[in-house]
Amino acid sequence: MDVENGEGQVQVHLKTKQEHYAVPDVPYAIDGTVTTVELNTFVNALLRQKDGSSDTDFDFLVFDEYLRGRLCDHLREKAISFEDAIEIEYVERFPAPEPQDCLLHDDWVSAVKASGKWILSGCYDNTLNLWTNKGKHILTISGHTAPIKAVDWISLDEETGRFVSTSQDQTAMLWQWNVGSNSVECVSVCKGHERGVDSVSVSPDGLRFATGSWDTMLKVWSAEQEDAAEGSSKRMKESGVRTPKITLQGHRESVSAVQWMDASTLLTGSWDHTLKVWDLSLEGIKTEISTNKSIFDASYSKLNRLILTASADKNLRLYDPRTNQGSVVRNTYLGHNAWVQTVMWSTTEEFLFVSGAYDNQNKLWDCRSPKAPLYDLLGHGEKVLDIDWSNPKYIVSGGVDNTVRVFKSRKALAEDTEAK
């Protein structure tokens, strides 16, 4: 029999890290043409024999990559001998996120960030908006004089929310929101960039934030409440103007992405085709990774310590900043049909991330499945500009169709099930 063409059987061991789904650890002979459909049927039959459990949907990993076709084709692509016993790992399938809300705005939504019960959005009409994660509009905030480009929360409790916004007006603004009275004030205007400010990220301790700009500069600022222009003129202090604590030069084009990797390390991505890792204690570049496309967004995972990029093509790419081979791409993810504008790792699920693109689509991915996303998250009628998964319960995105789309993730779906 020609096993390599799918005829005949392959010896496999079925493994799982989810012990309640474990089956006997013995070799099984299965047909080489099996797909996830037949493997699901087989594993569920074994589980019913073991304890009478009801059917569960599983995904299957063969040599650390999701099986997306026939087993024989997967093994051939990996150059694995068909005569060896093959280990197949199975995991409970992550449920499809469900659409919850469509939040209507007056202009393009270019920035979104969720925290607790709230969603903060920024628009091309120069305004910020606050919403509940159930879709109720709370407040419209004016202050910037050009389109908003990025937002981030500094701190949030039952009484007070603090956040930062950046704009094409060359400033960042610090805001304080009194939750009880639903009133907001601009605490400080942060001046120092000479072009629009494209990206922002607040430090893990909430004491600093970093901005990236079209002027190619990376700047670090104080986010503390009593710090307006420390060391600056009395006039600047009284007006609430802040100046940067640190300015770092190294990129040659717009700094389109910035994120704190830890308390003293920053990641940036740029239109100059590079990722840079900055050591703030030395105020210099620690690592540089060259890519072959302009970077629109980048995301670092504290769970797996890997970096994802969204670029000026249809692909997402995975990099390991710890490797000495800085330009080597760990994986490329194919699925979007236009430029990918935005990407973000899950903060709680080690292998999962979301992306949004100019093909009007969001996608949910597992980094072990490069050939296809887990799910398409449909709803936007125009280009997606920003996506956020800061709140593990909700995937939130904004776009050119003047909407924020809210999708329930597994944690919210589980709560709904428990409530019924």
From Swiss-Prot:
Which Pfam families does the UniProt record give?
A: NLE, WD40
InterPro entries reported in the protein's UniProt record: G-protein_beta_WD-40_rep, NLE, WD40/YVTN_repeat-like_dom_sf, WD40_repeat_CS, WD40_repeat_dom_sf, WD40_rpt, WDR12/Ytm1
Q: Which UniProt keywords apply?
A: Nucleus, Repeat, Ribosome biogenesis, rRNA processing, WD repeat
WD repeat segments: 104-142, 143-185, 192-231, 250-288, 290-329, 335-375, 379-417
Q: Identify the PANTHER family for this entry.
A: RIBOSOME BIOGENESIS PROTEIN WDR12, WD40 REPEAT PROTEIN 12, 37
Q: Briefly, what is this protein's role?
A: Required for maturation of ribosomal RNAs and formation of the large ribosomal subunit.
Among HAMAP family, the record links this protein to:
WDR12
Q: What's the name of the protein?
A: Ribosome biogenesis protein WDR12 homolog
